[in-house]
Amino acid sequence: MAEPSVLQKKTEIFLERDIYPLLKNFPASEKFSLCQEIKQSCYKLIRAAVMANNLTNVNRRLMWLDEADAEKTLLLVLLGVAKNQKYICLLYTSP
């Protein structure tokens, strides 16, 4: 088994440190819709990073990296929707 890639590690940290705390503030009506979609997108991003890291075939690796990029774009769209609905406010404070 290959060592976890930087993308995989950073996505896991992003999910734990940033996404989960944001999702706690969602209204109950959105817990099983937009909230769930955001979590699923993060999981798919991690999965794509793991798959790309464990493959040796360059073409298949690029396919999984393209999928990771698409999931990242979807995640940005979903977070934008949440921000527009005022479920979250994206204020970044450095640790």
Residue map of PLM features:
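Short Lys/Arg-rich basic patches
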Residues: 1-9, 60
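Amphipathic alpha-helices that form helix-helix packing interfaces
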Residues: 14-15, 19-22, 41, 45, ...
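Helix-loop segments that flank and shape redox-cofactor active sites
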Residues: 17-31, 51-59
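Surface-exposed helix-capping loop/turn segments at secondary-structure junctions
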Residues: 25-29, 81-88
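Membrane-helix exit/interface motif
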Residues: 46-54, 79-83
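Mid-chain, well-packed structural core segment of small domains
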Residues: 61-86
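Conserved small/polar residues in nucleotide/adenosyl-binding loops
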Residues: 92-95
